[in-house]
Amino acid sequence: MTIGALPPTMKAVVLEAPLKIAVKDVPTPTIQKPTDVIVQTTVAGLCGSDLHIYRGHIPIPLPITVGHELVGKIVQVGDEVTKWKVGDNVIVPFTATCGDCYFCKKGLMARCDTGITFGTGRGLEGCQAEYLRVPTADTFLFPQPDDIPASTLLLMADILPTGYFVASGGKRLLMESLGQPMTGDLVKDVEGKKEGVCVVIGCGPVGLCAISSAVRMFDKVFATDLAPHRLETARRHGAIALPEEELKAAILEATDGRGADVALEVVGHASAMLKAIDLTRYFGVVSSCGVHSEPITTSGYMMFNKGLRFQWGQCSVPTYFPGALEVLRDNKEIFAKFIEKKIDFSQAEEYYALFEKNKIGKTVFVMGGEKDV
């Protein structure tokens, strides 16, 4: 089924080479398999993870349409799709997954046997375009709630579930280390009782999502960032946000000299990971969702001596979506301010350059100039 005939070409944000973005006319996607849908974009996000591809740190075939965050309307449906119909408004998580492999069945969709992140190649273009082909649509899309604007809901495609993932992973490992029982209900387990001191390294968009999640789980949440203007924003999300030179002393004072129970590393740089390790107490927890592209060098004996527990990796959005959505519902006004810029595709080259230089915060592309979405 379809809503009329789609145009043969569409506007798309294309990475032609590292640091070289262009807005081009490209072929409009079509249904390739009966489990596909075609989604017309309402809003598409510019995410910090996009910078790893933009800078050339992650090798992918070029040119390619970039982006992996999208909220939009289904305009075509494959013959074997059962959960969705033309006209449905949906949130598209950043990775297409099969729903049937070992990892998907365990709720670990980030490691799906056939999973593909939008805008990274392997036959799946990115979300920063007027239309998007979504494979295996019955397995990982979510309906768009009516009470939250599309631009705010875009956070649910990646960074808010990722923030919830990194915070809840730290809390679960802390509970495990303390021998506390868990029911298997993720939200109930990690939010049932606030406990422990947490520190978040990095107060960019993902860091703020981690902070808003962590304040539901821990007694105290500290945070730091090298960019001073981000600290005030982190405070609005509930953190005790301090410059790096003041952070360690404050954490030691709050913990009788032990260090943080849990550190959340969301930057993806070796210095941030080493900072997280340094601030964490003996037998504490480090939980990381940072995308690291360089080696991390540290002392094996120091690591042995600290006895830390680690969680590290990519978020399985469907598993963490329910908890993250409640964080969003309870903080709608804060997250509405989270979107700093609403732009159209014609401004992509300019805003990628600004985002790469850390001169702007969360930015979204909106279709048709509708800035109130």
Language-model segment annotations:
Residues 247-257:
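Short amphipathic alpha-helix with an adjacent loop that forms part of the alpha/beta core around
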Residues 148-249:
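Mid-domain Rossmann-like dinucleotide-binding core that forms the NAD(H)/NADP(H) cofactor-binding site
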Residues 91, 264, 287:
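N-terminal Rossmann-like NAD(P) cofactor-binding module of classical short-chain dehydrogenase/reductase
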Residues 2-8, 274-278, 318-373:
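C-terminal hydrophobic helical "lid"/dimerization subdomain
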Residues 27-44, 55-105, 125, 145-147:
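Glycine-rich beta-strand-centered segment in the early N-terminal region that forms part
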Residues 47, 93-142, 146-150:
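Cysteine-cluster motifs in flexible loop/terminal segments that predominantly coordinate metals
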Residues 269-330, 366-373:
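Glycine-rich phosphate-binding loop and adjacent beta-alpha segment
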Residues 260-266:
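Short SAM/SAH-binding signature in class I
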